[in-house]
């Protein structure tokens, strides 16, 4: 694995680093290396933690597991393997059914997903694209199923992970073993990857799978080459 652009600090380097580590040990079962990288500038790490807590707070029908599923789809759309693995790990810990995680790219047709799920995921994936892909039709379907506050929660997850996607892909953050195991379990069962290939950014087969899934859901207007 390539050396990250900036090496993460040790969890015991400061009192604040230890406190943040304790929080993530509870939510993920480990502390992400990305947090220890942010700790080179503690205000950034603190602001991120507060934003994370605010975004993941549930005030409506969007559950904790749904938010992690949104994060998974958003991160896979943008191509961030690190965040994708973390989202799968968190979705498992917050109660996402295995059936949903295994079939999430077929959410348009799979019986594990409701019409409101489909509207939610359409919005999340379209919002994750650059240029932005949120159409008037996608907006109308989202408004049909969700309140303004719930739409804010959905897009809050997309925006939060947009920051993380760019941070971790640019930093080359080293993926932690628990996250690797969670993600490989899901994608290996779908025969999308073989062991040890998931987080190789040059994995053309995986990127092709993403492209095909998005095209099948008619969320890309044109083919996208990888």
Please tell me what each predicted stretch does.
Residues 1-226:
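Hydrophobic alpha-helical segments
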């Amino acid at each position: 694995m390539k050396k990250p652009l900036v090496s993460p600090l040790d969890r015991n380097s400061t009192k604040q680093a230890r406190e943040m580590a304790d929080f993530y040990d509870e939510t993920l079962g480990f502390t992400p290396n990305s947090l220890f990288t942010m700790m080179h500038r503690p205000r950034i790490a603190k602001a991120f933690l507060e934003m994370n807590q605010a975004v993941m707070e549930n005030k409506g029908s969007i559950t904790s597991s749904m938010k992690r599923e949104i994060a998974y789809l958003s991160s896979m759309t943008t191509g961030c393997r690190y965040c994708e693995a973390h989202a799968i790990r968190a979705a498992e810990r917050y109660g996402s059914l295995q059936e949903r995680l295994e079939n999430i790219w077929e959410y348009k047709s799979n019986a594990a997903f409701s019409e409101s799920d489909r509207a939610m995921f359409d919005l999340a994936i379209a919002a994750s694209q650059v240029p932005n892909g949120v159409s008037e039709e996608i907006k109308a379907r989202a408004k049909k199923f969700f309140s303004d506050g719930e739409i804010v929660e959905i897009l809050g997850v997309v925006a939060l992970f947009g920051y993380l996607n760019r941070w971790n892909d640019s930093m080359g953050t080293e993926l932690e073993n628990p996250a690797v195991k969670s993600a490989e379990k899901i994608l290996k069962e779908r025969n999308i990857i073989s062991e040890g290939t998931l987080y190789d950014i040059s994995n053309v087969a995986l990127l092709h799978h993403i492209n095909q899934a998005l095209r099948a859901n008619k969320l890309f207007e044109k083919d996208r080459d990888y």
